[in-house]
Amino acid sequence: EALGPVMSQHTGIDQIGRKEGAIGVFTAGKLTRSSVYHQAVVLALSPFHNAIYR
């Protein structure tokens, strides 16, 4: 079963996957899905932009 429907059922927030998502619920709104994805992309690309990795 997908996480979105389970989280919607648990929290009562309709279509939670289109809103704050599980990240927002688990962190009480301290982190957003967007901020977490942004950090993940920056970390994934850092070896290509930092000489220390060469």
UniProtKB/Swiss-Prot annotation:
This is Inosine/xanthosine triphosphatase. The lineage of its organism: Bacteria, Pseudomonadati, Pseudomonadota, Gammaproteobacteria, Enterobacterales. Keywords: Hydrolase, Magnesium, Manganese, Metal-binding, Nucleotide metabolism, Nucleotide-binding. The keyword Hydrolase applies. It comes from Klebsiella aerogenes. Its EC number is 3.6.1.73. One of its GO terms (molecular function) is nucleotide binding. It catalyses: XTP + H2O = XDP + phosphate + H(+); ITP + H2O = IDP + phosphate + H(+). Binds 1 divalent metal cation per subunit; can use either Mg(2+) or Mn(2+). Homodimer. One of its GO terms (biological process) is nucleotide metabolic process. Transmembrane segments: none annotated. Pfam families: NTPase_I-T. Phosphatase that hydrolyzes non-canonical purine nucleotides such as XTP and ITP to their respective diphosphate derivatives. Probably excludes non-canonical purines from DNA/RNA precursor pool, thus preventing their incorporation into DNA/RNA and avoiding chromosomal lesions. Its cofactor is Mg(2+); Mn(2+). The keyword Phosphoprotein does not apply. Belongs to the YjjX NTPase family.
